[in-house]
Amino acid sequence: ITDADISARGPKAWDDMLNTINICKFNIGSGATGIVTHSFYESLNHAAHRNVYGKYVTDFPHVKRLFLDSFCRLAAMKLFGLRATDYMRAASAEDKRYLLYNPIMKMKVAIQGEEVHEMLWDIIAAKGFEKDNYFSQAVVELRGFPKLEGTRHVNMALIAKLLPNFFFNPKEYPEIPRMNGPENDDYLFQQGPTRGYGKIQFHDYNIAYNSVDLPNVNVFKEQINAFVEWLMLSGMELKDQMLGDFDFLLAVGEIFTLVAYGQLIIESAAIEEIDEELLNQIFDVFVRDFSRYALD
């Protein structure tokens, strides 16, 4: 290796490496979304043409529920990805909110993809093992996505550092529009030093949640309020608990992640003009997820 082959040395080399990961990890969520979308329609096509006991598989109540939840989770994955893209492209030295949303895109969206795939597999059963369909290969590839660039525990420990500022120290920012034009993405190639991660501030999550009045979103808001109250009562002891027990950190981090996840989905739904019935049903799934994480 010659000097001509080395692009950076010292602290800059370290910063460039981590900043490259900040961007590349985003593609893990995008890849999972694409894989699951293909598997969803392949599974639906199979089930809609398979007749069992005089009924098509898609007519069974439990299959309807599995397809409904799968569709809602997949729609949420896509909506989050669209909005997270906006924050990544709008990033600057003064606005580094993407450093929360990109890890969520990598970890949360990829794991959601696994959950959707498991539900689809419950529908198509043995068909998922056959080598002449897409699903069998998707199973192999999708399982590895959440493990790329660190385990979920590592990513959650990183995200948890942002919890205090997210809930208790919001900052006003100009509203970020849809960023799907030919804007110059030069900041993504010059992100600067990687220090100061825990000092990043975010816009008030209540702005998004208060912009809609839907039954399941309102229940979800009650859950958020209960979580915030618990955080306030826990105080500084919470940090010590999370550092000493990674399973506890994972459960707390999952709830925090779900709040930010839902926030961007509401923002994205408004931009994409998503039907309120679909948004309400997505939060039906989230209310159940929130309860499960709280029990953990």
Each PLM stretch: what is its role?
Residues 1-296:
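Flavin-dependent oxidoreductase catalytic core characteristic
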